[in-house]
């Protein structure tokens, strides 16, 4: 019971998780939408911990393309209407460059047109190649690092690897966008994602 309460508080606090905001480097925001409450909450926490790890590692290494990353995590509870609201909230924030979500078919289907209409790149977790991946086959170093960012040294779940790889693909897209266009925008990142393939922990990933 106490663990559940702590997790709920962490999810609420994670609505806006800023990584490295004390840096003088400009910040770009990555949206993460997942079910942090309800019957699919384990998916949400698996995603949150993995995304948090990936963003921390990128920022600790100096960021990407002259930017630090900030993770904006929103709960859609696996509910289509909440997914629609979360997508709209992220879409109107000009600082949000891309979104990783929504992990479940119906919320993703509902949210996708909102991102498209506003030019927000979406990496749709839950669709190939970002389907559940056996965490027992992930490198031990990743599993240890994942446990270290959780409140109770928890074990990585089936969406840990795919989420980590999605952030890794975004890192590459940000770098390519800056290199090819001299700027990091929704449009330049979308174009870069369309060209990229990235070898991650779970295999080759790309924008489906």
Please place each PLM-identified region on the residue numbering.
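Extracytosolic ligand-binding ectodomains
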Residues: 2-4, 8-15, 20-208
């Amino acid at each position: 019971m106490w663990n559940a309460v702590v997790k709920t508080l962490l999810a609420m606090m994670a609505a806006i998780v800023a990584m490295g905001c004390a840096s003088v480097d400009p910040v770009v925001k990555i949206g993460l939408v997942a079910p942090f409450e309800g019957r699919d909450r384990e998916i949400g926490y698996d995603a949150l911990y993995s995304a948090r790890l990936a963003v921390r590692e990128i920022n600790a290494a100096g960021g990407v393309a002259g930017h630090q990353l900030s993770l904006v995590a929103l709960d859609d509870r696996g509910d289509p209407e909440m997914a629609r609201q979360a997508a709209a909230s992220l879409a109107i924030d000009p600082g949000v460059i891309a979104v990783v979500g929504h992990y479940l078919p119906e919320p993703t289907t509902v949210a996708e047109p909102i991102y498209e209409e506003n030019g927000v790149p979406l990496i749709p977790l839950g669709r190939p190649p970002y389907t559940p991946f056996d965490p027992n086959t992930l490198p031990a170093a990743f599993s240890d690092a994942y446990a270290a960012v959780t409140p109770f040294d928890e074990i990585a779940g089936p969406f840990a690897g795919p989420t980590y790889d999605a952030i890794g693909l975004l890192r590459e897209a940000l770098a390519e966008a800056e290199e090819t266009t001299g700027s990091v925008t929704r449009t330049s990142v979308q174009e870069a994602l369309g060209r990229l393939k990235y070898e991650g922990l779970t295999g080759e990933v790309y924008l489906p």
